[in-house]
Amino acid sequence: MASTMTPYFGIVVSLIAYGIGTFLFKHSKQFFLFTPLFVAMVLGIGFLKVGNFTFEEYNTGGKIISFFLEPATIAFAIPLYKQADKLKKYWWQILSAIIVGSICSVVVVFIVAKAIHLDTAIMNSMLPQAATTAIALPLSESIGGIPAITSFAVIFNAVIVYALGALFLKTFRVKNPIAKGLALGTAGHALGVAVGIEMGEVEAAMASIAVTVVGVVTVVVIPLFMPLIA
């Protein structure tokens, strides 16, 4: 069992699971349940369970991949640079919309968790789900949450937005590209950005800035709820 403690174990499991997810997504005409992140998560959990491996054994290498999540978010700056003129022109409206959306997300999760009497650890795990994984996981751990539950919540949330985001926008007749991008990024994280890229450069840029600002707002807002949870 000592060999499974090397970093290669977690890295290889992660890459293979993600590779299978990418293959299934591509050959299923992008069926939303085969989103690579979701498939990788399900396969990874299944493999660890069937092989009777512990999370610690996996995470020896898994945390190396997690480390690169944070610098990878720098890539969001590319579409932002291309749409700098719109950011300067509508910066107040953009920031206001993202901040309100972020706070609403945290408040709704808090109210629902309280209403159904969720365990404190689970509640703390769910609160950061508004942020992207790179921010949500360390935040969850810092407030006494369970990162694994947080990861599931973030990814599941993003998959829903990836699958139904465009439909929701069409149903509610949201036609402004800036509004579309902000909605997708605020609700769907990186997968929301992916949908934005499919729609256009403006949507992609707005979704990218939403992911970044939501993370900052979540980090600031969630500690304010801690006295209410304790």
From Swiss-Prot:
Q: What is its main location?
A: membrane
The subcellular location is: Cell membrane
Q: Has keyword Protein biosynthesis?
A: no
Keywords (alphabetical) are: Cell membrane, Cytolysis, Membrane, Transmembrane, Transmembrane helix
Q: Which InterPro entries match?
A: Antiholin-like_LrgB (IPR024891), CidB/LrgB (IPR007300)
Q: According to its record, how does it sit in the membrane? A: Multi-pass membrane protein
Where does the chain cross the membrane? 5-25, 31-51, 61-81, 92-112, 149-169, 177-197, 209-229
Provide the Gene Ontology terms for cellular component. Answer: plasma membrane
Q: Which GO terms describe its biological process?
A: cytolysis; killing of cells of another organism; programmed cell death
What is the similarity comment for this entry? Belongs to the CidB/LrgB family. LrgB subfamily.
Kindly give the PANTHER family that the UniProt entry links to this protein: PLASTIDAL GLYCOLATE_GLYCERATE TRANSLOCATOR 1, CHLOROPLASTIC (PTHR30249:SF0), PUTATIVE SEROTONIN TRANSPORTER (PTHR30249)
Its job: Inhibits the expression or activity of extracellular murein hydrolases by interacting, possibly with LrgA, with the holin-like protein CidA. The LrgAB and CidA proteins may affect the proton motive force of the membrane. May be involved in programmed cell death (PCD), possibly triggering PCD in response to antibiotics and environmental stresses.
Name the HAMAP family on file.
LrgB
Listed NCBIfam families: PRK04288.1
Name of the protein = Antiholin-like protein LrgB
